[in-house]
């Protein structure tokens, strides 16, 4: 049964990805033409933005939006797909700015916007100036995508009241995601592993943003359903926690090929995760000291990363985090089972829930 549910999820996601990619192609081609009339440098930026958004991304958020739309009784899936384009562009805006805040130069297995421009500017500028200028361009690219998000919504062929409700939803999500992002950034410099703060970051930066918001946007697009909005919030809260813990484990123990980011990036950035919280609780003092001295150190080597990984495994922190992810997954599945929606959507939501925890990239 689970294999059949996963097959349906994969088929739906492949379909959504194809449809969203077509819409991205059309949207950015129009923007590139408009930018060319202003300046060739501006045109180049839009070309780079188009290549970046097309290079990676699983299009999970638009897929979830369609599921939320269907669950709420929506039937015009072409219009729902048109609306879900806003989610993918919004997500790209958040990713670009997230990479700037984290100091990352790669995403999707290659250079991100900062990385692309850092390489170009390094040929003519000193290292610090090249990096600053590249990050400035990346911030601009992110802001353009934020603007494009709302532009997509204003051009939808649906009731204006629904468009306004969708805009209000995005504004709330942006405000709350900003809170999660700030808490995440601040936790890296405070160095205090606070469970309540870790869970708050996971809720606002992942659960609400990745799971709850896309589902609720689908409900809004279908005309709204307050009970379903609350149910999706409960579901997203549990699954988002499972997703983030699984993501932390993948980031720590996965390869660059799997994650598209450098191995050990979470260690270098000093990320305060549930995995690290368990490590502090379970490690012997000298073991934790070995981890602590490497957290937030950008100059750690691959050998340092291997050492931290081994300590996390042998201390039981890795296993405890995996159990926590599984517990939240089971809670999410219970919420799905109690939903008053069509069985096909329930089965795909079950498959998506499992995928969030077992995924390898």
Predicted regions and their residues:
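All-alpha prenyltransferase/terpene-synthase fold signal
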Residues: 1-361
